[in-house]
Swiss-Prot record:
It comes from Populus trichocarpa (Western balsam poplar). Its main location: membrane. GO terms for cellular component: plasma membrane. Residues 1-4, 69-83, 149-170 are cytoplasmic. This is CASP-like protein 2D1. Disulfide bonds: none annotated. Belongs to the Casparian strip membrane proteins (CASP) family. The keyword Plastid does not apply. The keyword Transmembrane helix applies. Keywords: Cell membrane, Membrane, Transmembrane, Transmembrane helix. Homodimer and heterodimers. It is found in: Cell membrane.
Amino acid sequence: MLKLLDFSLRLSVIPLSVATIWLTVTNKQDNSIYGYLKYSDLTGLKYMVFISGICASYAFIAAVSTWIRCIVTKTWLFFVSDQIVAYLMVTSGTAVLEILYLAYNGDREVSWSEACTSYGKFCYRMKLAVILHALALSCFIILAVISAYRAFSIFEPPLVPSKVVEEDRA
């Protein structure tokens, strides 16, 4: 059951990440006042595309690897890799969320006005990409918990001497 859930989550991440990449890379809008805006103008979006590519590639390799017996026994490899990918996804998602926040609200202290009134389509597509990225991240958080369970369930719980237990009760 756990193996099927693991495999399904890894497969689910692939289309979510690919859709995130597609929405972001094809995101562009022209404005007669401010000019042409495309995803490559914003470093945070380029970072999210890069991390989404890593995420989709790793999810594919890991999904295939879950059915190869010699690799499945390497629970620590999956545990560490799932943690790293989840953390990378958090960093890229928060970078784009910061861009979205500034695009919608601006920053009066540094005289930045909001951009989404002028680039509504661009902001909408960026929001959709962040939502898809968050769904992929949710899958990886669950995968990180599953891989942690697998990695740590092979150990016995520590034995507590009976003397220590008696002192704690007193």
